[in-house]
Structure formats: structure tokens, C-alpha cells
Amino acid sequence: MSLLTKAAAEAWGTYLRQRDERCEDAIRCDYGVFQFRNTVFQKTLSMLQGLYLRQYDPPALRTYVQRHQGTTVALRNPANWFLVMREQAAIPQIYARSLAADYLCCDDTLEAVGVLAVRPPDSDLTRNTKQAQELPCVLMLSHYGTVYVYDWETDGLYEVASDIKAFSKNGLLWCEYVYRHPQTPFATTEPRYHVQKFLCTDPTDAAAVAKTAREMSGLNLVIRTPGRTEVEPLLMLGSIEGLRACRPFDHMPAADFRDLLNFIRQRLCCEWYVVGLVGYYLAYGPFVPSGLVLLDKFGVVYLHKIEDSDLYRIADNFHMFLKCGLLKLRGLCRFDRGLRGECRLEELPVCHHTLKRDVLRWHGALGTITRSQLESALDWFLRPTRGTDKVPNNSSAWGRTDLLPTGALQDNQNWAFPSHSVETLPALQGGLWEDNDETTQTVDGQRCFRMPKFFPPPMCRVPYNECGVELPGGDSSDEDESGRPRRIANRIGDTPETPCNSENEDDTTVEGTSGGPEAMDSQAPYPSEDSPTTEKEAWLQRGRRAKAMHARGHTLKQVPIPEPDQMGDDGPDPGP
């Protein structure tokens, strides 16, 4: 019997500890749990009231943090996480750095209020001692009250809440680092046998994960996304042949399907593996996919969205995907330094700065909010009757959206009392924050740089850019003599690989480019490089290609995928 890897064993233990065999009605206890959640929200906000009352006064906020340095505050989602107050000068990873100018899409100022820590798990012998493990995450407040978390391990800045009230309600639900931590419970736990098979697989072995998916071909995983009550099916495929047999890919011409495989190979700069399709089922049977879930050779999980035919990173590995679901495409905002967001294939973060400034300006509150106003608002949010006079009318609010049982927060509040009694163990000081290479350099001074996309006529009759502005047509340099959009040229001498072998080479084989005219073109958008052996090498190749394409004015060619109304009753194109 083969031994499980350390990652698989930790994931398996976390999964077993979180299982609850009781029915859903018994778990949420109808009205009682909603009232209890309001109580937990009020207790969290009351512990953060010092930050709430000083969120628009940076000097007062800095003084407050210095005076309460070392104080431990219990947070939500997960409930066993804490905030340890610490001033910015005591955190070397952010000291003397301008995070707002290097990461955010708009000018702003960020003030550090402390680092995050986690209580030891139940199996830890030191759990009953007053010790907590610090994490490589810094909690920060912006000039407009927005809450951010800077993760120096992966050098990412996350927008976790629009204000402290929302942070008290949702906690760290929108912090990506939470779902990389081994103690975080899994959101996707059913069907039990399917999940167990994946948890026993090494998450960094993409071939093994794809093989497991292929063994379950035709079955569904129940994908749950934290903070959302609805579930989505993940139809397991595990092979390119299975993908070709599913709609709408079975109605794609053979040339377009080969272009799609080539596009994915070129975007990832390495070989890749099919996992399955996410979407929804119609009442009369057909499955309508919204995206293709796939892995690169390093085990990173991506989603190829059918809506815009592009790739987006959704998890660092499949175990993390079982924890966070599709959260990264449901509103999680990650800001990266320089070119790294494009190298990681992260979705472009949504800018909330202009909207919040406009809201404050419309209410006449831009730069004029006083402490007395905040005290009045706090008095209303902490009213004793909030748990009974704010009951939702819709049934969707009764779902289980907490990462841990709500009562765990009260337990950790008692454990951390008094606030200075908890000893914290320092986190690892190294991380990607120390990098200063090609991936961290800006492109023409642009913030949040992403490669522009070109939508071909079969997908969108009039192409538009990211801002909705109509692009020039006809004589555009993005089309060749035949009127077809110019594809991203392959690397010279490189034959794209597909780890999954095809039974029908006419339909699914990814054609090499060593004999084509594009491969011989000396103006290839990016130079020839060897296949990457590490994820960092793949990042460098993606960054170099993006800079070369940007310098030549090239755009990404989006392969058209048929919409349901464009598919007839005829079968797939047999190809040449």
C-alpha cells in the first residue's frame, strides 16, 4: 500500500474533521442561527470599533495601533484566525514601500494595522496553550476605509472588504491566502467518494489529477463557492477526447478546435490537462457549460471561460480549488506588482476606487466624516435588537456560508482574553515580495497590465476593447489576407504537446508549427524558449511574450466557441 503525500494526508485529515452528517435543517436551526450570526457580527464589530472610529483619520489610526501593539483580536471566516496589532515600521516586508503605487489601479494610501495569525489545530498538542502562529499576511486600511490584506509570500494584495462593517460581516472570506492554509475546511465535499479520490492524489501531480478525473468521466462534483448558497456541477472529463464529444465543442470545426488547443498551449507556455466543465443542467437534460477547468503541468488550476474565450487562474492546486471553488471569478480582487498579474493569468481586478469616491462625494462625505458621525453609526449597528429586526425575507440567506461553525468565534474570543495574553510565533519572513525581476517590472508604466483581447467576427460582429470602445475594422493589423484574425504565432521549432492522446487525429491533434509559414516568420511575437521546468520559468515566458506582443501591437486571438443558438442538429465537422 503506497503512502499518501504530506499534502494529501493534511487535506484528508481536514476533510474528515469537518464532516457533519446531520441534515441541513438541523445544522442551521432555522431562525436561531441567523440571530446568532448577527450576534457574532456585532461582537466582531465591537472588537474592531477602535479601527472603525479612526478609519478616515490616518494619524489617529497610527497612534491607536502603536498604543495597542500586540493586542489580539478574533476575526471571522475562518473563526480561528486573529489580528495581531502591529505598526508598519515593525513589519520589514512593507516598511518604506509604497504598496498603493506599485499594486493598486488608482492612487491611494494604505496604513498597516497588524498581521494575521491562526490558532493551532485540534490535533496540535499546544492548542490549549496561549500561542498562535503568525501568517505572512498584513491587514491594511486605505484612505477611503477599504480593507486590504497584503500576502508577502506570493506578493499579492487582496481587497477583502469595502469597509470595516463589511469586514466584520464577511471576515476574511475574500482573502486568497485563507484557502491555501491547510486548516481551512473544504467547501466542496460531495459526492463523498469523488472527493476522497481527489484528496488521496498529490495536488502538484497534474497527470494524476487528470487521470482521477478521467476515471470519473460523466460524473459530477458539487462545487460550492464560499459565501454563496447556490452550487454548480463540475462534469468530469479528464481527456481531450471527452471534451471534443461535449457541446458546444462537438459543433466546432476541426480547425477551430485545433486553434483552441493551440491557444491554451500558448497561453500557458507548457503542456496542460483537462479536468472537466462547469456550467448548469437544463430541466430537459442538456448540460450548458460556462467554462473549462484545466491544469498546467505544475498542477495550477485554470478556467477557460466560454464567454470571452480566455484563461484565468482560479487555484494554486486542486486541493485549494476544493476549498475556494470559483471564488476568484466571483469577485475576489487580487492586485499584483508589475507584470506578475499577466504572468499568473489572473483576472483583471475590478476598480472600486472611483465608485467609492463618487458615493462619498454624492453624500457630501468626501473628507468630511467626523468621529461623532462614526460613533452614531456604530451605536446603530450595535443595537441589541438587530438580531430580531433584521430577518431576511428570501430563503437564500439561510444557507451555510461560514467557513467554520459560528460558535467557534466565541470560543476563540474567550481563548484570546485578555487581549495581551496570547503569545504569537513569527511567520516565515521570505517570499516573492523580495523578487525584483522581469515579472515585477511595469509595461510602459501601466498598472494592472493585461494583454488586450480581440474578438473575431463569428463571436462578436463588432469588436470592442476592454472599455467598450469600438475598435477599427477592415484594415486592422489583427487580420490576415483571408479576413481571419491573426493567431498568436507559435514558438520557433516548438511542437505543442497534449498529454492526452487522441483517437481521432483529424479532430483533436494539436498540429506542430515547424513546417508552417508562421513558424518561419522572423517577426514571431515572442522568442523561442525551452519548455519550462518550474512555474517561475513559465511566468517569465508569459511575461516576455506579453511584452513582445505589446511592443508590436498584437492582441490575443479569441477562438470562437459556438453559442447554443448557433448550433444546429447536425453533428460535428469531420474535418479535412
Curated annotation (Swiss-Prot):
Signal peptide: none annotated. Transmembrane segments: none annotated. Residues 471-576 are annotated as: Disordered. It is found in: Virion tegument. InterPro entries: US22-like. This is Early nuclear protein HWLF1. Residues 566-576 have a biased composition (Acidic residues). The keyword Transcription does not apply. Belongs to the herpesviridae US22 family. GO terms for cellular component: viral tegument. Residues 542-555 have a biased composition (Basic residues). Its main location: virion. The gene is US22. Pfam families: US22. Keywords: Virion, Virion tegument.
